[in-house]
């Protein structure tokens, strides 16, 4: 159920590390941790807030109390750093989850929505052993990838593109055309297992 303040997006405030990463600051790309204030109660962070694992609601809930930044209805968490320009690359170890979404989202997207279900988030989803790109709850299949141990994400803010990357071949698997209107943050959703993020990486040569 939505709370009375559910639409007060302009009141959002991030943690102490929350800032915009600009092109001049991104030689090594975005460096981030996961922001526990945004994490749904079914999610728990680990390994210095770089990993997230799924648990039944009430079994291993986040220790953060309900607040304006927290996702209320879906198992979503955002990173603690935003991007406003430049090209950025990070990787996600996905081998321990069978159902997840990874991508980016506007920092002020509705906390009653799930990433990929609205037009303010852009993600790649994995479920039932199949990959899809997602925007506004519309799915497009991505074939020939399987479930690798790790995948990369390449964000080009000015070109408004988000790409899924094969980390072994260092090649783009699929690209989403986006419509960024403001700061975006890496975004993650999962319904089993765990995801581990790897940031502060240089954009690989050839991408």
Swiss-Prot record:
Which domain of life does the UniProt lineage start with?
Eukaryota
* TM regions (residue ranges): none
According to the UniProt entry, which residues carry N6-acetyllysine?
A: 53, 130
- Keywords assigned: Acetylation
Q: Which residues form the B30.2/SPRY domain?
A: 12-207
Sorted alphabetically, the Gene Ontology cellular component annotations on this record are: nucleus
Q: Tell me if Acetylation is a UniProt keyword of this record.
A: yes
Tell whether Acetylation is among the UniProt keywords. yes
Q: Which cysteines are joined by disulfide bonds?
A: none
Pfam families the UniProt entry points to: SPRY
N6-succinyllysine modified-residue sites: 139
For this protein, the record's PROSITE patterns field holds: B302_SPRY (PS50188)
What name does the UniProt record give this protein?
SPRY domain-containing protein 4
- Point out the gene that encodes the protein: Spryd4
């Amino acid at each position: 159920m939505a709370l009375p303040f559910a639409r007060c997006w302009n009141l959002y405030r991030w943690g102490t590390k929350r800032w915009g990463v600009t092109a001049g600051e991104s030689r090594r790309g975005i460096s981030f941790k996961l922001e526990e204030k945004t994490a749904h109660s079914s999610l728990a962070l680990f390994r210095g807030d770089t990993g997230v694992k799924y648990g039944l609601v009430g079994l291993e809930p986040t220790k953060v109390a309900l607040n304006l930044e927290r996702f209320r209805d879906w198992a979503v968490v955002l990173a603690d750093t935003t991007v406003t320009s430049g090209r950025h690359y990070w990787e996600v170890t996905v081998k321990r989850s069978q159902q997840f979404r990874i991508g980016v989202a506007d920092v002020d997207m509705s906390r009653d929505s799930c990433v990929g279900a609205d037009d303010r988030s852009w993600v790649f989803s994995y479920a039932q052993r199949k990959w899809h790109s997602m925007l506004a709850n519309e799915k497009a299949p991505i074939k020939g990838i399987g479930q690798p141990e790790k995948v990369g994400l390449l964000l080009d803010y000015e070109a408004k593109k988000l790409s899924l990357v094969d980390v072994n071949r260092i090649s783009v698997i699929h690209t989403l055309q986006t419509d960024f209107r403001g700061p975006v943050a890496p975004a993650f959703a999962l319904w089993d297992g765990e995801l581990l993020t790897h940031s502060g990486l240089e954009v690989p040569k050839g991408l």
